[in-house]
Design a protein with these regions (language model features):
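N-terminal low-complexity or simple alpha-helical regulatory segments
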Residues: 75-77
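Basic, Lys/Arg-rich alpha-helical nucleic-acid-recognition elements, primarily the DNA-binding modules
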Residues: 1-72
Length: 77
């Protein structure tokens, strides 16, 4: 569960630094605002596709950073 919390907090930091609402983030992955909240709190598992879509929305273009976060998502599940 520690990895879920770590990944969730990193996703929240990225979302907030870009000024994106939970609602907009949820819309981008076909989910609710509450699912984004649960993801950011580490309470649910992560789908690689959702993490990829969120990273794109949040403007994370650096391949090393993307790979690191996607690897963390795989390990968190």
């Amino acid at each position: 569960m520690g990895r879920r919390i770590l990944l969730g907090s990193q996703l929240r930091r990225l979302r907030e630094s870009r000024g994106i609402t939970r609602e907009a983030a949820g819309y981008s992955i076909r989910a609710s605002e509450s699912k984004i909240s649960r993801m950011e709190l580490g309470r649910v598992s992560f789908k690689a596709r959702d993490v990829e879509d969120l990273l794109t929305l949040y403007g994370v273009a650096d391949e090393a950073e993307r790979d690191s976060l996607l690897g963390l998502a795989r390990e968190a599940n």
